[in-house]
């Protein structure tokens, strides 16, 4: 995290992250950048680009990317896959615009899935995405 956040986290250090990866550890980035005006999506995109990540796993309050807000439109269609450019062009706001552009320009795909799904994070880490894969 970019700030002190209790016993379960450490302050972000690129060197410490690289050391953790070298030791085969699974690391989570939390807390965004620690600066106002930047979302947690942008923070994770920044860290993923810095660390040359293969992809970003985004656990959200929604279970994927939809063509419209499923809370408003009961007929909203969930995408299994979509490109970042399509997300931007269609103004699908599940991932913020800055993070989307950063990921597109740096060829970092994303997987969007529900934070509330049982074993959702573990499944996503195993490549079993029950959500939307957003390709760069």
Label each residue range with its predicted role:
Residues 1-136:
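C-terminal catalytic "cap/lid" subdomain
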């Amino acid at each position: 995290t970019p700030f002190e956040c209790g016993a379960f986290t450490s302050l972000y250090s690129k060197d410490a992250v690289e050391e953790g990866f070298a030791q085969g550890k699974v690391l989570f980035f939390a807390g965004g950048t620690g600066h106002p005006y930047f979302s947690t999506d942008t923070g994770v995109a920044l860290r993923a680009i810095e660390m040359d990540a293969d992809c970003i796993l985004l656990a959200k309050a929604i279970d994927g990317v939809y063509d419209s807000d499923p809370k408003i439109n009961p007929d909203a269609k969930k995408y299994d896959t979509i490109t970042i450019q399509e997300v931007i062009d269609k103004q699908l706001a599940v991932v913020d615009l800055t993070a989307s552009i950063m990921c597109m320009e740096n060829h970092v795909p994303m997987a969007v899935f529900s934070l509330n799904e049982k074993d959702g994070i573990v499944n996503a880490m195993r490549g079993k995405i029950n959500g939307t894969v957003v390709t760069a």
